[in-house]
UniProtKB/Swiss-Prot annotation:
<keyword id="KW-0862">Zinc</keyword>
<feature type="topological domain" description="Cytoplasmic">
    <location>
        <begin position="132"/>
        <end position="787"/>
    </location>
</feature>
<comment type="similarity">
    <text>In the central section; belongs to the AAA ATPase family.</text>
</comment>
<feature type="binding site">
    <location>
        <position position="425"/>
    </location>
    <ligand>
        <name>Zn(2+)</name>
    </ligand>
</feature>
<feature type="compositionally biased region" description="Low complexity">
    <location>
        <begin position="700"/>
        <end position="709"/>
    </location>
</feature>
<dbReference type="Pfam" id="PF17862">
    <property type="entry name" value="AAA_lid_3"/>
</dbReference>
<dbReference type="InterPro" id="IPR000642">
    <property type="entry name" value="Peptidase_M41"/>
</dbReference>
<dbReference type="Pfam" id="PF06480">
    <property type="entry name" value="FtsH_ext"/>
</dbReference>
<dbReference type="InterPro" id="IPR003593">
    <property type="entry name" value="AAA+_ATPase"/>
</dbReference>
<dbReference type="InterPro" id="IPR003959">
    <property type="entry name" value="ATPase_AAA_core"/>
</dbReference>
<feature type="binding site">
    <location>
        <begin position="203"/>
        <end position="210"/>
    </location>
    <ligand>
        <name>ATP</name>
    </ligand>
</feature>
<feature type="compositionally biased region" description="Low complexity">
    <location>
        <begin position="650"/>
        <end position="671"/>
    </location>
</feature>
<dbReference type="InterPro" id="IPR027417">
    <property type="entry name" value="P-loop_NTPase"/>
</dbReference>
<keyword id="KW-0472">Membrane</keyword>
<feature type="transmembrane region" description="Helical">
    <location>
        <begin position="111"/>
        <end position="131"/>
    </location>
</feature>
<dbReference type="InterPro" id="IPR003960">
    <property type="entry name" value="ATPase_AAA_CS"/>
</dbReference>
<feature type="compositionally biased region" description="Pro residues">
    <location>
        <begin position="710"/>
        <end position="720"/>
    </location>
</feature>
Length: 787
């Protein structure tokens, strides 16, 4: 309901209430009378203080005009009171005995009042009936509830472009094609391509899905409607389906246009007969959305872009081609993506020379675009808090810590003993990780309390990794158990500070056994399956699909992994106890240590050999032959420069070569049209020249140069002939693709018909350019994606 409708409704209600109050106020003839108890009225009658009286028999009330007011009547000389049923005769006799003027009034009641008593409920019922009828009428639902809440972006709003999006180049390229189709449909229609009807953006929160949609809105140049999935469903039945219909009606009236539905999982969750039943309001909304996206109705020129964090719970009918033709993953940015994101968000901000954005990108593995934007913004806020003029490297470092662990707890006062335990605990983590061979180096260790932690050690990977080996996961276990081992080794008793470390180690060990099949005893088997209900939006837990004996074996294997890591951490700390004491002392003095300082402390620490107790392949003997070397490794061995990456996928190069061959053939055919006339146009020898021009007239087998009245037979002007192709010649690109002879493919709805491409006498943009000279990632069928 918009603001204008609310104002109208409130005004109408106020007018009706005011009119009703005015009617009853001005029709009341008891104004001016003071209401008193019946006993007070009787005392005035008995005291000969009544000048005149009026008995209202219908209302059972008595009006008295007194000779003089007194304390009982609060000084009023006009009073009114009620009397019991059947007491009117006694009142009349009492007043007559006092020689008081008595008037008896029997009110018949007003006709308007009678009508209001009977007609008002009837009008109320009729109004409710009309309102519910309009609610069932689709978009004209009562009070505007069925109207779509989609907002159409205006031209005055600040625009986001693809240049403002970084770190998700693949998604930008896919969406750029949508924008290019809307602005330049001819190139696609000539090939018979159809624009995708729907695009689904899915990925973790903060990766830039909504930002991509805003960029499309800023660059498309067509009407853009935006709505949230939660705006469809309300408390009234039928509201969601009505709003879906109204949204697509608006879109069709403004086609070509784009609709963006954010958080579509609020309305597009998988249907079922469990919770909610088949008549659930959300299911009705989803069914209407499915019909509008791809049903019997016409949906010309309407593109639906949706975003979600949970593609796994969406209904399969919503994800099929024809509804969401293109599903684009938007994942966390890699190293190059993080660099680009930091450059975008630091643009326009005064960054100091000592601020290393490239190093910051390396230290923020796993952060999303939103996290990186928050880091830069937090650094700017910290600089402004200290009245600084430029954002420095330490400010960015502090901002990273604030985003990861929360603000520093400055007001927390801890004892010297607890601070010492924290220093040894974090030192145990750091030393255990430094001595393990398959773990990322420790970048920073601190005992400053942040959020719910009393300190932390940060291990930063030097490069992005998509795979983890068993040795790396065991090293992570040793790293996690280093704090508990230090507590037991130095203070001879554990503390509660290792609760998060134990939880992390248990999770890693259990996933190694039950998910990744890294236990030789249990084999490469996945134990436990997730089960739940899609209505809840998440799984309801893990179902144990194995026996009690297997469960006991799983617990034994998990315990064995953690105990081995605990023992390894203990041995490392025992061997380098002096180094641990030195590290703890430095932490107590400086509170935070970085990698250069740690390298000086750990100069005597050597890498431990890998744990081999779990290298059991069940009787299978691994090969002694090493794997082959990559081209980069071979180039390093030979002292050669690093090999260049593959410039573009094979299909792009193939398309470019075929397009150039087709263009060359077309130019050769055009040059032959200006040559000297040869033999007849209808003989068998003339067919070769005609084929070079494309299909014109069929060859009827007449002798060369032979003519006769009515020969050759004439065909209708728009008669269609199948194209003929030379054995060694590719067809001219692009070729028409009619659905049947005599009819060319219709242009895309709401667009003007396309001119031929390339125009006669002109060459394609890349004609005559060998494949090696084509720009990397650019081909006639793949325009560059800006930003």
């Amino acid at each position: 309901m918009n603001r204008k409708n609310v104002i109208r409704m409130v005004t109408a209600i106020a007018v009706v209430v005011l009119l009703g109050w005015s009617f009853f106020y001005f029709s009341d003839d008891t104004r001016g009378y003071k209401f008193v108890d019946t006993s007070v009225a009787m005392s005035q009658i008995n005291g000969h203080n009544v000048k005149s009286a009026q008995i209202d028999d219908r209302e059972q009330q008595l009006r008295l005009t007194l000779k003089k007011g007194n304390n009982d009547t609060d000084g009023s000389d006009k009073v009114i009171t009620k009397y019991p049923t059947g007491y009117a005769v006694d009142l009349f006799n009492a007043l007559s005995a006092k020689n008081t003027k008595v008037t008896t009034a029997v009110n018949e009641g007003s006709i308007l009042g009678e009508l209001l008593v009977y007609v008002l409920p009837l009008l109320l019922l009729v109004g409710l009936f009309v309102m519910f009828s309009r609610m069932q009428g689709g978009a004209r639902m009562g009070f505007g509830f069925g109207k779509s809440r989609a907002k159409q972006l205006s031209k005055d709003m600040p625009k986001t472009t693809f240049a403002d999006v970084a770190g998700v180049d693949e998604a930008v390229e896919e969406l750029y094609e949508i924008k290019d189709f809307l602005q330049n449909p001819c190139r696609y229609q000539t090939l018979g391509a159809k624009i995708p009807k729907g695009v689904l953006l899915y990925g973790p929160p903060g990766t830039g899905k909504t930002l991509l949609a805003r960029a499309v809105a800023g660059e498309a140049g067509v009407p853009f409607f935006t709505i949230s999935g939660s705006d469809f469903v309300e408390m009234f039945v039928g509201v969601g389906a009505s709003r879906v219909r109204d949204l697509f009606d608006q879109a069709k009236q403004n086609s070509p246009c784009i609709i963006f539905v954010d958080e579509i999982d609020a309305v597009g969750r998988q249907r079922g007969t469990g919770l909610g039943g088949g008549h659930d309001e959300r299911e009705q909304t989803l069914n209407q959305l499915l019909v509008e996206m791809d049903g019997f109705g016409d949906r010309a020129g309407v593109i639906l872009i949706a975003a979600t964090n949970r593609p796994d719970i969406l209904d399969p009918a919503l994800l099929r081609p024809g509804r969401f033709d293109r599903q684009i993953p938007v994942s966390n940015p890699d190293l190059a993506g993080r660099r680009a994101v930091l450059r975008v968000h630091s643009k326009g901000k005064p960054i100091a020379d000592d601020a290393d954005l490239d190093g910051l990108a390396k230290r923020t593995v796993g952060m999303t675009g939103a996290d990186l934007a928050n880091v830069v913004n937090e650094a700017a806020l910290l600089t402004a808090r200290e009245n600084g003029l430029v954002i420095t490297g330490p400010a960015l470092e502090e901002a990273v810590d604030r985003v990861i662990g929360g603000p520093r707890r400055k007001g927390r006062i801890i004892s010297e003993q607890e601070k010492k335990i924290t220093a040894y605990h974090e030192g145990g983590h750091t030393l255990a990780a430094w001595a393990m061979p398959d773990i990322e180096p420790i970048y920073k260790v601190t005992i400053l309390a942040r959020g719910r932690t009393g300190g932390h050690a940060v291990a930063v990977p030097e490069e992005d990794k998509g795979l983890r080996t068993r040795s790396e996961m065991i090293a992570q276990l040793v790293f996690a158990m280093g704090g508990r081992a230090a507590e037991e080794l130095v203070f001879r008793e554990p503390t509660t500070g290792a609760v998060s470390d134990i939880e992390k180690a248990t999770k890693i060990a259990r996933s190694m056994v039950t998910e990744f099949g890294m236990s030789s005893k249990l084999g490469a088997v996945r134990y436990g399956s997730e089960h739940g209900d899609p209505f809840l939006g998440r799984t309801m837990g893990t179902q144990a699909d194995y026996s009690h004996e297997v469960a006991r074996d799983i617990d034994d294997e998990v315990r064995k992994l953690i105990e081995a890591a605990h023992t390894e951490a203990w041995e490392i700390l025992t061997e380098y106890r002096d180094v641990l004491d030195t590290l703890a002392g430095e932490l107590l003095e400086k509170e935070t240590l970085h990698r250069p300082e740690l390298e000086g402390i750990f100069a005597s620490v050597e890498k431990r050999p890998r744990l081999t107790m779990f290298d059991d392949f069940g009787g299978r003997i691994p090969s002694d032959k090493p794997p082959i070397k990559t081209p980069g490794e071979l180039a390093i061995e030979r002292g050669e420069p690093w090999p260049q990456p593959v410039p573009e996928p094979a299909f792009k190069a193939a398309i470019a070569r075929a397009s150039q061959a087709a263009e060359a053939s077309h130019q050769a055919a055009q040059s032959d049209t200006d040559g000297p006339p040869g033999q007849g146009a209808n003989g068998s020898h003339a067919g070769d020249r005609q084929r070079q021009h494309g299909p014109t007239q069929p060859d009827y087998g007449a002798p060369p140069g032979w003519h006769a009245p009515g020969w050759p037979p004439q065909q209708p002007p728009d008669y269609w002939y199948p194209p003929e192709q030379q054995p060694s010649q590719s067809p001219y690109w692009p070729q028409p693709a009619p659905s049947y002879p005599g009819q060319a493919p219709p242009p895309y709805p709401s667009y003007p018909p396309c001119p031929s491409y390339p125009p006669p006498g002109q060459s394609a943009p890349d004609a005559g350019k060998p494949p090696a000279q084509l720009d990397e990632g650019v081909s006639p069928s793949n325009p560059p994606a800006h930003g």
